[in-house]
C-alpha cells in the first residue's frame, strides 16, 4: 500500500548528491511515488545533478542488429525469443562489410558510439572472430567508440574483444532479481551479472540497465538502480517495456510518460556520475514528454532499435537543439 509522504525538498536532495552524499533507498522510492504534479519539480532537481556532471551535452548511440531472432532463450519481453510469435525479420549474421557500413551510417547520424548487437544466448568463438574483424576495420577508419552486445561471454572472449578495441559491453540486468524468474527461465539473474563482471575484468567499460514496466514493484524499481550502482555500470540504458504482440508480456500495462520520467530522475539521483540513456520505448512510452527526459538523462539512441522503429535522426537533432543542448559526437 502506498504510504502518505511529506513533500520533500527535491532541490536540496539534488545539491546533497552533487556534494557526493548518496541518497537513501527511501528517497529513491519517494521519487517514484511522488504525485504526478511534482514531476517537473523533480526533473528540475535531477537537472542540477545532470548539468553538474555533464553540462548540456547529449551522447548519441546507434544500434545495428547483426543477427535477428533465432534466439533459444525464453525472455518474455523479447520479440526475438524462441517462444515469441511476433512477426519480425529473422536473419543470421550480417557480413563484416555490412557491419562496417553501419558504422559510417552512425557517423552520418552524428552518433559517437556504435552498438553491435546480436541475438542469442552466447556467441561462438567463430562469431566473436567475425565481430572482431569488423571492429578492427571500424577502429582503423573512424573515431567511433564501439559497444558490443552479444550475450554471455567467457573470460577469453571478453579479453579478445577488449584487445580488438571494443570500448563497451552491454549486458542488461533487465529486471530485479526477485522478478527474474517471472521473465525468463533459461538463464538466471546471476548469469547476467557474471557477464557484466567478466567484461569489466577484461578492461571493457560495462553497460547495463533494465527494462522497466515488467511487473516489478516500486521498491524493486528503486533497488535496480542501487544494484546498477553496486556493479558500477558506466552506462545505464533505461528501457521501458513495449508490450509487443506475440510475446508473453503483450498484455502488460505499459508505464505512463510521467512514470517514465520518475524512473529517469530516480536513476540520475542514484547514479549521478553515470551515462543515463533513454533507450527502448522512448518514443512509444514517453511520447510528447521525450524532451523533458533529457533533463535527467544525457544519452539516447538515434534511429531504430532492435525490432522496433525509432524516430528520424533529424527529429532527435531538433529536439536536442530546441532544448539548448549540444550533441557530443564520437565520445564514450
Curated annotation (Swiss-Prot):
Q: Which GO terms describe its molecular function?
A: 2 iron, 2 sulfur cluster binding; 4 iron, 4 sulfur cluster binding; biotin synthase activity; iron ion binding
Matching Pfam families = BATS, Radical_SAM
Quote the record's binding site residues for [4Fe-4S] cluster: 71, 75, 78
Annotated residues for binding of [2Fe-2S] cluster:
115, 147, 207, 277
The prosthetic group or cofactor this protein requires is: [4Fe-4S] cluster; [2Fe-2S] cluster
Keyword list, A-Z: 2Fe-2S, 4Fe-4S, Biotin biosynthesis, Iron, Iron-sulfur, Metal-binding, S-adenosyl-L-methionine, Transferase
User: What EC number(s) does the entry state?
Assistant: 2.8.1.6
Top-rank taxon, per record? Bacteria
GO BP term (any one):
biotin biosynthetic process
Q: How the cofactor binds, per note?
A: Binds 1 [4Fe-4S] cluster. The cluster is coordinated with 3 cysteines and an exchangeable S-adenosyl-L-methionine.
Segments forming a coiled coil: none
KW Transferase (keyword) present: yes
The Radical SAM core domain extends over 53-282
SUPFAM superfamilies found in the cross-reference section: Radical SAM enzymes
The keyword Cytoplasm belongs to this UniProt entry's keyword annotation: no
Q: Which InterPro entries match?
A: Aldolase_TIM, BATS_dom, Biotin_synth/BioAB, Biotin_synthase, Elp3/MiaA/NifB-like_rSAM, rSAM
Q: Give me the reactions it catalyses.
A: (4R,5S)-dethiobiotin + (sulfur carrier)-SH + 2 reduced [2Fe-2S]-[ferredoxin] + 2 S-adenosyl-L-methionine = (sulfur carrier)-H + biotin + 2 5'-deoxyadenosine + 2 L-methionine + 2 oxidized [2Fe-2S]-[ferredoxin]
Q: In which pathway is this protein known to take part?
A: Cofactor biosynthesis; biotin biosynthesis; biotin from 7,8-diaminononanoate: step 2/2
The record ties this protein, via HAMAP family, to:
BioB
What protein family does this chain belong to? Belongs to the radical SAM superfamily. Biotin synthase family.
Q: What does this protein do?
A: Catalyzes the conversion of dethiobiotin (DTB) to biotin by the insertion of a sulfur atom into dethiobiotin via a radical-based mechanism.
Spell out the subunit comment. Answer: Homodimer.
Mind telling me what this protein is named? Biotin synthase
- The species is Bacillus thuringiensis (strain Al Hakam)
- Gene for this protein? bioB
